[in-house]
């Protein structure tokens, strides 16, 4: 009987130990072989919906991946929205430069031009070195 509960992933067993005996009831419910009394309610709910409503611990156990996906889905959505806004403002690479200028016009214009020149020269040297290295290799 214990081996069945141990066969579950460790991540699931940890919240159970925190939640207490209620989680054991759901463990028995999810494992119909172990619990005969709860098997009827499990057959009706198929996913311990009754035990879910009675205790919150099974929700953390059974729908852990569901909760994670739900919690992750709203958080990246505002990020995607922000990225979408930037992409609309700056659809191309030169557009991103104009965006940076619009945010910090005075400071970025002079510095950016110098940096651009340095970056371009560095990139050229790097590409030449890489290409020559590849040829020799």
Swiss-Prot record:
GO cellular component: nucleolus; nucleosome; nucleus
Biased composition range(s): Low complexity: 22-74
UniProt subcellular location: Nucleus; Nucleus, Nucleolus; Chromosome
Binding site for Zn(2+): 12, 16, 24, 29, 31, 35, 38
Region annotation Disordered: where it falls in the sequence: 1-137
Assigned keywords, A-Z: Chromosome, Developmental protein, Differentiation, DNA-binding, Metal-binding, Nucleosome core, Nucleus, Phosphoprotein, Spermatogenesis, Zinc
GO MF assignments: DNA binding; zinc ion binding
Pfam families for this protein: TP2
Domain of life of the organism encoding this protein: Eukaryota
Family annotation (PROSITE patterns): TP2_1 (PS00970), TP2_2 (PS00971)
Feature: compositional bias, Polar residues: 1-21
UniProt short sequence motif Nuclear localization signal, positions renumbered to this chain: 110-118
Tissue and organ expression note: Testis. Expression is restricted to haploid germ cells.
GO biological process: acrosome reaction; penetration of zona pellucida; positive regulation of protein processing; sperm DNA condensation; spermatogenesis
Ranges of biased composition (kind: Basic residues): 78-91, 126-137
Alphabetized InterPro entries for the sequence: TP2
Record-listed Phosphoserine modification sites: 132
First-listed, main subcellular location of the protein, grouped into a coarse class: nucleus
Family: Belongs to the nuclear transition protein 2 family.
Biological function: Plays a key role in the replacement of histones to protamine in the elongating spermatids of mammals. In condensing spermatids, loaded onto the nucleosomes, where it promotes the recruitment and processing of protamines, which are responsible for histone eviction.
Protein name: Nuclear transition protein 2
Organism annotation: Sus scrofa (Pig)
Upper classification of the organism: Eukaryota, Metazoa, Chordata, Craniata, Vertebrata
Gene transcribed to yield this protein: TNP2
